[in-house]
UniProtKB/Swiss-Prot annotation:
Residues 33-259 form the ABC transmembrane type-2 domain. Part of the ABC transporter complex NodIJ involved in the export of the nodulation factors (Nod factors), the bacterial signal molecules that induce symbiosis and subsequent nodulation induction. Nod factors are LCO (lipo-chitin oligosaccharide), a modified beta-1,4-linked N-acetylglucosamine oligosaccharide. This subunit encodes the transporter. Its main location: membrane. PANTHER family: NODULATION PROTEIN J (PTHR43229:SF2). Belongs to the ABC-2 integral membrane protein family. Lipooligosaccharide exporter (TC 3.A.1.102) subfamily. The complex is composed of two ATP-binding proteins (NodI) and two transmembrane proteins (NodJ). It is found in: Cell inner membrane. GO terms for molecular function: ABC-type transporter activity. This is Nodulation protein J. One of its GO terms (cellular component) is ATP-binding cassette (ABC) transporter complex.
Length: 262
């Protein structure tokens, strides 16, 4: 690793907390509006698809469709919350408000900033995903214990999609480019990864492809927990999510370094 790259890596194990705290203090002023905005879409989908389509579909994989869907919506909510926090809020702090430039005049490195942004986005995903789980538990489609047990996977899902989105904002010149990521990456994952309907209904080639996507690993961990079943290949899914979180993190640091040096 060259000295230039090493100099932008996280300086230590705790500097990132300053970035997290800064974002939390700013978010606290608009917390209610932020939470409602993050929850409106997944809750609408949960009730609309769950009760509407559920009457037609009936039972799926041994459970009611709305219980099946609720677990998928927890994963989707974690994905979208972390993604949009990174795409829009982190991009604004980096490119529009130039907050990152000001922070770099302190003892924090670029790696500290990126790590703090990732953990902050994951924190918001925990709030969003857990809130959907609470709705499901309140309606009797999940147990309170299962929702608590799903929180670590929700947090890891948030880290994964924040890390992937961080690569996107390191390359995107403006907000306009985010629509390509949303349309070509996020939306297909929602429908291919088993969140809305079982992947067993798809052709084998699609199943193999979907199994490589990060949301599929998240769904395959969250759904068994919320339905109080054993998760198959849990270690494989956790390992895959860790790879999806770590590799884009290091890639984004290198890309941000090149961008800021222009």
């Amino acid at each position: 690793m060259d000295d230039g790259y090493a100099s932008v890596m996280p300086a230590n194990a705790y500097n990132w907390t300053a970035v997290w705290r800064r974002n939390y203090l700013a978010w606290r002023k608009v917390a209610l509006a932020s939470l409602l905005g993050n929850l409106a879409d997944p809750i609408t989908n949960l009730f609309g698809l769950g009760f509407g389509l559920g009457l037609i579909v009936g039972r799926v994989e041994g459970t009611s469709y709305i219980a099946f869907l609720a677990a998928g919506m927890v994963a989707i909510s974690a994905m979208t919350s972390a993604t949009f926090e990174t795409l829009y809020a982190a991009f604004a702090r980096m490119d529009v408000k130039r907050t990152w430039e000001g922070i770099l005049f302190t003892q924090l490195t670029l790696g500290d900033i990126v790590l703090g942004e990732l953990v902050w986005a994951a924190s918001k995903s925990v709030l969003a995903g857990t809130a959907i789980g609470i709705v499901a538990a309140t309606l009797g489609y999940a147990s309170w214990t299962s929702v608590l047990c799903a929180i670590p996977t929700i947090a890891l899902t948030g880290l994964v999609f924040a890390s992937l989105a961080m690569v996107v904002i390191s390359l995107a010149p403006t907000y306009d480019y985010f629509v390509f990521y949303q349309s070509l990456v996020l939306t297909p994952m929602v429908f291919l990864c088993g969140a809305v309907f079982p992947t067993s209904q798809m052709p084998d080639s699609f199943q193999h492809f979907a199994g490589l996507l990060p949301l599929a690993h998240s769904v395959d961990l969250i759904r068994p927990v919320m339905l109080e079943r054993g998760a198959d290949n849990a270690a494989l899914h956790v390992g895959a999510l860790c790879v999806y979180a770590v590799l884009p993190f290091f890639a984004s640091i290198a890309l941000f370094r090149r961008r800021l040096l222009r």
